[in-house]
Amino acid sequence: MQLNSNGWHVDDHIVVAVSTGIDSMCLLYQLLNDYKDSYRKLTCLHVNHGVRSASIEEARFLEAYCERHHIDLHIKKLDLSHSLDRNNSIQNEARIKRYEWFDEMMNVLEADVLLTAHHLDDQLETIMYRIFNGKSTRNKLGFDELSKRKGYQIYRPLLAVSKKEIKQFQERYHIPYFEDESNKDNKYVRNDIRNRIIPAIDENNQLKVSHLLKLKQWHDEQYDILQYSAKQFIQEFVKFDEQSKYLEVSRQAFNNLPNSLKMVVLDCLLSKYYELFNISAKTYEEWFKQFSSKKAQFSINLTDKWIIQIAYGKLIIMAKNNGDTYFRVQTIKKPGNYIFNKYRLEIHSNLPKCLFPLTVRTRQSGDTFKLNGRDGYKKVNRLFIDCKVPQWVRDQMPIVLDKQQRIIAVGDLYQQQTIKKWIIISKNGDE
């Protein structure tokens, strides 16, 4: 049984995840024998999930085996009682906790590569699992031989080796191992695929499960193309404020993307900047219908902290205003520089004193201002509509009134002609 040893070097500290099953024990045997000169140091990690009674016996067996072969061994016992009590998917919970511990130990050991015993049959099983449960469209279809984790790499040297070859190797060299009885229980989906579905396909001479590997290769190439296209789109069209985590993108440019690419773009943005994961395809599709509607403004709640705002031609992700304090009314009695919500007001000393005190407030129903250069008045609300000002900006924008309570400025959109040089309003942070 030949390992693919391209994933580590002769001066590497390699770590093997050993369950005591036939796959990992055969991998360990090969590393101790035919591949003993391919690394600098070898360490074993073993996880006791604490679910089966045989777990204690397996851990003791591995301790004795590693002591006999002078291998450092670290064992972790997981507490999965919470998942058992709530009837959650214990396999998924165990995997998450297992890899959290692997991350921790690889850092503690300052090791280079973690080896796992995933083999060809595991690959085929995973491909089928992801196709059948709908997780194939936004993930790679199976395992990569080499993948990156936090500060180290995971390598799968048995990925081209079949289960049949592993069994033959074990029988030839009488390698000790433990059989996990739960692997025979078809109530677990992966077991059902492994024990029932794949053998049924193999019995049909016109079908070959191995063709799934060609599908994986094609699928993963398309996946990489989508990832690249999403990054290109983000670089070209997305504006992001790191401090406030305010994100803005052209609504039209986003709507022009195919749905598959839209999902990847949002996956990238929401996971990277907002730590939001696993939003369903169905939810995304509902959003896309709203994004492409003719409605000029609306909002979608992401979480209790984040919201998507659609404002005319922009798609915006921003913090909710809940809990934020905004000025509603402010009195200015003399020239100077002032901050009102997210705006900076520069009141020059040349502004006629008869206009003081100034009142700065947010909009009110029925607000109007005198048009510059012609007779008549215009509603502030109509100005907002004409300038396509988003609702939440309207709620914060400063409206300046003189001593007689006449509107002489509306944010950075309007200043009365006679005082234009002496009241300058800009968004706070703008140059």
From Swiss-Prot:
Q: Which residues bind ATP?
A: S19, T20, G21, I22, D23, S24
EC number of the protein: 6.3.4.19
Looking up PANTHER family in the UniProt record yields: TRNA(ILE)-LYSIDINE SYNTHASE-RELATED (PTHR43033:SF1)
- Which GO biological-process labels does this protein carry? tRNA modification
Q: Summarize the protein's role.
A: Ligates lysine onto the cytidine present at position 34 of the AUA codon-specific tRNA(Ile) that contains the anticodon CAU, in an ATP-dependent manner. Cytidine is converted to lysidine, thus changing the amino acid specificity of the tRNA from methionine to isoleucine.
Q: State where it is primarily located.
A: cytoplasm
Keyword ATP-binding tagged: yes
Q: What keywords are annotated for this sequence in UniProt?
A: ATP-binding, Cytoplasm, Ligase, Nucleotide-binding, tRNA processing
Q: Cite a single Pfam family from the UniProt record.
A: ATP_bind_3
Q: Does the keyword NAD apply?
A: no
Fetch the InterPro entries from UniProt.
Lysidine-tRNA-synth_C, Rossmann-like_a/b/a_fold, TilS/TtcA_N, tRNA_Ile_lys_synt, tRNA_Ile_lys_synt_N
One Gene Ontology CC term in the entry = cytoplasm
Q: Which CDD domains match?
A: TilS_N
Signal peptide span = none
Q: Which segments does the entry list as coiled coil? A: none
Q: Which SUPFAM superfamilies match?
A: Adenine nucleotide alpha hydrolases-like, PheT/TilS domain
**Reaction catalyzed:** cytidine(34) in tRNA(Ile2) + L-lysine + ATP = lysidine(34) in tRNA(Ile2) + AMP + diphosphate + H(+)
Q: What class of enzyme is it?
A: ligase
Where, per UniProt, does this protein localize? Cytoplasm
**Encoded by which gene?**
tilS
Organism (species): Staphylococcus aureus (strain COL)
UniProt-recorded name of the protein = tRNA(Ile)-lysidine synthase
Top-level taxon in the UniProt lineage: Bacteria
State the family named in the UniProt similarity comment for this chain: Belongs to the tRNA(Ile)-lysidine synthase family.
Single Gene Ontology MF annotation: tRNA(Ile)-lysidine synthase activity
Record's domain comment? The N-terminal region contains the highly conserved SGGXDS motif, predicted to be a P-loop motif involved in ATP binding.
